[in-house]
């Protein structure tokens, strides 16, 4: 599904841990790294596409994550001319993306890059929050910078929030 301007609707996913680090995934059989992302199918909402891509690419389900934020607007990047498939119609010149910031609430061991017969990634690691902006392929860099700027205050607040106090068991609470 390509829009009238030649952009493919897509979702991007930033997964953070409790320390404010983000998951950085290595493209299968390549030396390039990126955040999970993928196309939105006809009739699918961005949130539905995000959960589908989350499972397909990194093996996580709704129970493994919590949505912290999503971008206010669609963000676009153009593909370099050498990557545009000029022989397909309609021609896709880039991606327009809705991004989601997720907190991993399960253990790292739930991450599984092998849920598909054609995996997108073959490795991953936790990296500092701003690291991806400097390391992603150049044509995605502006979108990554905008995404990370928009999500930064949420991640900072999340990191600085004190842990929720555990309530005492009912038998230990004072009465009266």
Swiss-Prot record:
Q: Name one GO molecular function term.
A: mRNA 5'-diphosphatase activity
- Cofactor or coenzyme needed: a divalent metal cation
The entry's keywords: Hydrolase
> Which top-level group of life is the source organism from?
Bacteria
Q: What class of enzyme is it?
A: hydrolase
Protein task: Accelerates the degradation of transcripts by removing pyrophosphate from the 5'-end of triphosphorylated RNA, leading to a more labile monophosphorylated state that can stimulate subsequent ribonuclease cleavage.
Q: Name one GO biological process term.
A: mRNA catabolic process
Domain Nudix hydrolase positions: 6-149
**Native species of this protein?**
Enterobacter sp. (strain 638)
CDD domains for the chain: NUDIX_Ap4A_hydrolase_plant_like
Q: Which InterPro entries match?
A: Nudix_hydrolase, NUDIX_hydrolase-like_dom_sf, NUDIX_hydrolase_CS, NUDIX_hydrolase_dom, RppH
Gene Ontology CC annotations of this record: cytoplasm
Encoding gene per record: rppH
Where in this protein would one find the motif Nudix box, according to its record?
A: 38-59
Query: What EC number(s) would the UniProt record show?
Result: 3.6.1.-
Q: Which family does it belong to?
A: Belongs to the Nudix hydrolase family. RppH subfamily.
Q: Which Pfam families match?
A: NUDIX
Protein name, UniProt field:
RNA pyrophosphohydrolase
Family matches, as Gene3D superfamilies:
Nucleoside Triphosphate Pyrophosphohydrolase
């Amino acid at each position: 599904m390509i829009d009238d301007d030649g952009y493919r609707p897509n979702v991007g996913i930033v997964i953070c841990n409790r320390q404010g680090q983000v998951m950085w995934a290595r493209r299968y059989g390549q030396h390039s790294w990126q955040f999970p992302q993928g196309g939105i199918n006809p009739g699918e909402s961005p949130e539905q596409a995000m959960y589908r891509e989350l499972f397909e690419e990194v093996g996580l389900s709704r129970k493994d994550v919590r949505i912290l934020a999503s971008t206010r607007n669609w963000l676009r990047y153009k593909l370099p001319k050498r990557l545009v498939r000029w022989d397909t119609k309609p021609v896709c010149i880039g991606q327009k993306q809705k991004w989601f910031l997720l907190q991993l609430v399960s253990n790292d061991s739930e991450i599984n890059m092998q849920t598909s017969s054609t995996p997108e990634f073959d490795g991953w690691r936790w990296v500092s929050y701003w690291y991806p902006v400097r390391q992603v392929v150049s044509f995605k860099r502006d979108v990554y910078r905008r995404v990370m700027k928009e999500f930064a205050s949420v991640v900072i607040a999340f990191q600085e929030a004190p842990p929720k106090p555990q309530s005492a068991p009912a038998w230990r609470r004072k009465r009266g």
